[in-house]
Regions:
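Anion-recognition interface
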Residues: 2-330
Length: 330
């Protein structure tokens, strides 16, 4: 499938191809009014990306669109409302001011095998930001989030893990299967492989990796390191409020309507969600239909089993990123 957008001096093509690198070819040059992102927060899911996105949005030298997680890139990703067009994607950044760094945050870019190559060809000098968390904790938080979004029909985390092999074969998927890959818990946290894809394409000097643990224990220092990486004023200090905390749904029916509207409504929702006012109204409705509630601890025996299972991967990830992750194995 091929997307094409024509501008006064630019033709941008996105060719959807199989393999690790899918091609975006562009005729380079200065095009008045066309702004493209130059940095990307690519994941990981449930690892502090929403907080970092909000903190960066408040920086006067940084522009990030109102719509978090546009997920424009990635031929191997599914989307609730379908893939936006290139013109819709570029429109997200049209309010950026001269001299601002321009970025976006789509947490499933880390999972995708095609996104790194697409970003590199779309924005050749792009910088990549990755937040990481203990994969066992990510899976557990992921399950809670999918339950909140009415995308997971297995209330028990262990049952959801047990269903993963069948789901990867297209079986036992909950109705409607909006984004099946989000249900592949173990497969989605193969962080060493995912990061190596980005390092091969962008090199270590253009990939900044931070830990969720650091963001929690020393938010200011972690944020300042990101600002240094982006080359913007590192002394700016936003309100370090908590974002995207664990919540419980009040009405499952309302939640399903918001996240998975019926077919006749889905087309309109796809268009309307691009407007900031509609987006704010949706967020307000989500807020009314939920209440903050601390996540119950994972079953101790299951957690111990998963930590043993993921110990080799954590050790390999430690080598890839050059950080001591021994605390994750406790």
């Amino acid at each position: 499938m091929r997307y094409r957008v024509r501008g006064p001096e630019e033709i941008v093509e996105l060719s959807r191809r199989s393999g690790e690198v899918s091609t975006i070819q562009s005729v380079q040059g200065t095009v008045e009014g066309v702004v493209r992102p130059d940095f990307f927060i690519v994941g990981a899911f449930k690892s502090g990306t929403t907080a970092l996105y909000e903190y960066l949005r408040s920086h006067p030298q940084v522009f990030m669109p109102f719509l978090k997680e546009p997920h424009f890139f990635g031929d191997d990703l599914t989307r609730h409302y379908g893939r936006m067009s290139l013109s819709e994607y570029l429109a997200l950044f049209r309010d950026a001011q001269p001299g601002q760094r321009v970025g976006e945050a789509s947490t499933w870019y880390l999972y995708s095998t095609t996104v790194p190559g697409q970003i590199a060809e779309f924005s050749p000098q792009a910088q990549i930001i990755i937040l990481l968390r203990n994969p066992v904790d990510v899976m557990y938080a992921q399950h809670s989030q999918l339950r909140f979004r009415a995308d997971e029909d297995q209330a028990d985390f262990a049952s959801a893990l047990e269903a993963e092999p069948a789901r990867r074969r297209g079986e036992r998927l909950p109705p409607p299967p909006a984004r099946p890959e989000t249900l592949f818990y173990r497969h989605s946290v193969q962080f060493a492989d995912q990061i190596e894809r980005y390092l091969r394409i962008f090199g270590r000097d253009r990939v900044h990796i931070a830990l969720f643990d650091d963001l929690v224990t020393d938010t200011a220092a972690t944020y300042r390191a990101v600002l240094d990486f982006l080359g913007v004023d590192p002394t700016f200090r936003p309100d370090f409020a908590v974002h995207n905390e664990s919540k419980r749904v009040r009405s499952g029916a309302i939640q399903r309507l918001i996240y998975n509207p019926p077919g006749p409504v889905r087309g309109a929702a796809r268009v309307l969600r691009r407007y900031p006012l509609v987006h704010r109204a949706r967020d307000a409705l989500l807020g009314l239909n939920s209440r903050a509630e601390g996540r119950q601890p994972m079953d101790a025996r299951l957690r111990a089993e998963l930590l043993d299972e993921f110990a080799p991967q954590i050790e390999r990830l430690s080598t890839v990123i050059g950080r001591d992750l021994s605390a994750w194995r406790n």
